[in-house]
Swiss-Prot record:
<feature type="transmembrane region" description="Helical">
    <location>
        <begin position="323"/>
        <end position="343"/>
    </location>
</feature>
<keyword id="KW-0999">Mitochondrion inner membrane</keyword>
<keyword id="KW-1133">Transmembrane helix</keyword>
<dbReference type="Pfam" id="PF00033">
    <property type="entry name" value="Cytochrome_B"/>
</dbReference>
<feature type="transmembrane region" description="Helical">
    <location>
        <begin position="78"/>
        <end position="100"/>
    </location>
</feature>
<dbReference type="InterPro" id="IPR030689">
    <property type="entry name" value="Cytochrome_b"/>
</dbReference>
<feature type="transmembrane region" description="Helical">
    <location>
        <begin position="113"/>
        <end position="133"/>
    </location>
</feature>
<comment type="subunit">
    <text>The main subunits of complex b-c1 are: cytochrome b, cytochrome c1 and the Rieske protein.</text>
</comment>
<feature type="binding site" description="axial binding residue">
    <location>
        <position position="84"/>
    </location>
    <ligand>
        <name>heme b b562</name>
    </ligand>
</feature>
<dbReference type="InterPro" id="IPR016174">
    <property type="entry name" value="Di-haem_cyt_TM"/>
</dbReference>
<keyword id="KW-0349">Heme</keyword>
<feature type="transmembrane region" description="Helical">
    <location>
        <begin position="352"/>
        <end position="372"/>
    </location>
</feature>
<comment type="similarity">
    <text>Belongs to the cytochrome b family.</text>
</comment>
<keyword id="KW-0496">Mitochondrion</keyword>
<dbReference type="GO" id="GO:0045275">
    <property type="term" value="C:respiratory chain complex III"/>
</dbReference>
<keyword id="KW-0812">Transmembrane</keyword>
<dbReference type="InterPro" id="IPR048260">
    <property type="entry name" value="Cytochrome_b_C_euk/bac"/>
</dbReference>
């Protein structure tokens, strides 16, 4: 009896074990769609970014004009540009939901998968920040100046590191050129990390909503979950196209339609909306070094989650943790909103309270799990 080529061909069988004959838990819900959607988002970003880079000019005198040229003169250039910009927003929506699902269902106990995921998050955030600088509008320039200047808070070597990063004594042409180079290369590094992320995931198998061992009853990924994931893709693409075709600049900053001017500071400097929660945490600390540490901690704190020990994987069995988790999501949304506001009352005090609560979640969550395990005994 001849075996299908997908099971014998050296290259195709790798794809087969990852996407077709992959044993998947029978009870995974729609929350497990987002990994596939992130793959779709990454594909869209690389594809649109590749074509945009053919027309973009990484020079401070020409960058803004080249983006304008792409939107006005290149065939469907406007579509490529807004797809790339809003595709980034869709990427982060899927990314944050993917992480939230991992926290809720305790997927962080898949240690290597979780750690590579945190590295991926940092890489994607770095890539998005570098891309925000490239149009060379007012917010691009001042965002780059403010955020990169935070490195000067590093004791002893901070100022030297900033000058090394800028390629001079201010954000200038050298900065733009290296940011473009890094923005071009990092998505391919992300792609390689995704392969490693999947490699570790397929060593252990996926978690499931009950958090139980599902080795006894798994089903092939295709056709069951390919159909389920394709439905998610259709919904995501539909939402993305509504955003792109009816409100393409809804999530971008009006200041970025003004060419970069080092002599005029915008009234309110802020990053893209998906970084606002971290930006609010940064601004809530009155000390520069403390703010930078809090900013880094807001993302890097995810690496401590595998240290948590609880008897059940899923938060479905921990009512107190469920309430705490949804409170944490509310805090995240409120921090995002406050990050877009001016640094004045009541936002400043609110940000400080919410920052404390944000970090308090990671202390209180394992304690509540232990308490509930004790009560249930």
């Amino acid at each position: 009896m001849t075996h299908p080529i997908r099971k014998t061909h050296p290259v195709i069988k790798i794809m087969n074990t990852a996407l077709i004959d992959l044993p998947a838990p029978i009870n995974i819900s729609a929350w497990w769609n987002f990994g596939f959607l992130l793959g779709m988002c990454l594909s869209i970003q690389i594809f649109t970014g590749l074509f945009l880079s053919m027309h973009y000019i990484p020079h401070i005198d020409l960058a803004f004009s080249s983006v304008s040229h792409i939107c006005r003169d290149v065939n469907f250039g406007w579509l490529l540009r807004v797809l790339h910009a809003n595709g980034g927003s869709m990427f982060f929506i899927c990314l944050y939901i993917h992480i939230a699902r991992g926290i809720y269902y305790s997927s962080f106990h898949l240690y290597f998968t979780w750690m590579t995921g945190v590295v991926l998050l940092i890489l994607v955030m770095a890539t998005a920040f570098l891309g925000y600088v490239l149009p060379w509008g007012q917010m691009s320039f001042w965002g780059a100046t403010v955020i990169t200047n935070l490195i000067s808070a590093v004791p002893y070597v901070g100022s030297m590191m900033v000058q090394w990063l800028w390629g001079g004594f201010s954000v200038d042409n050298a900065t733009l050129t290296r940011f473009f180079t890094l923005h071009f290369i990092l998505p391919f590094v992300v792609l390689a990390m995704v392969a490693i992320h999947l490699l570790f995931l397929h060593q252990t198998g996926s978690n499931n909503p009950l958090g139980l061992n599902s080795n006894a009853e798994k089903i092939p990924f295709h056709p069951y979950f390919t159909i389920k994931d394709l439905f998610g893709v259709v919904v995501m693409v539909w939402l993305l196209m509504i955003l792109v075709l009816s409100g393409p600049y809804l999530l971008s900053d009006p200041d970025n339609f003004i060419p970069a001017n080092p002599l005029v500071t915008p009234t309110h400097i802020q990053p893209e909306w998906y970084f606002l929660f971290a930006y609010a945490i940064l601004r809530s600390i009155p000390n520069k070094l403390g703010g930078v540490v809090a900013l880094l901690a807001s993302v890097v704190i995810l690496i401590i989650l595998p240290l948590y020990k609880n008897k059940f994987m899923s938060s479905s069995f921990y009512p107190l943790n469920q309430m705490l988790f949804w409170g944490f999501i509310s805090i995240f949304i409120l921090l995002t909103w406050i990050g877009a506001q001016a640094i004045e009352e009541p936002f400043y005090t609110s940000a400080q309270i919410l920052t404390s609560l944000y970090f308090f979640y990671f202390i209180l969550s394992p304690l509540l799990s232990v308490l509930w395990d004790y009560v249930m005994e």
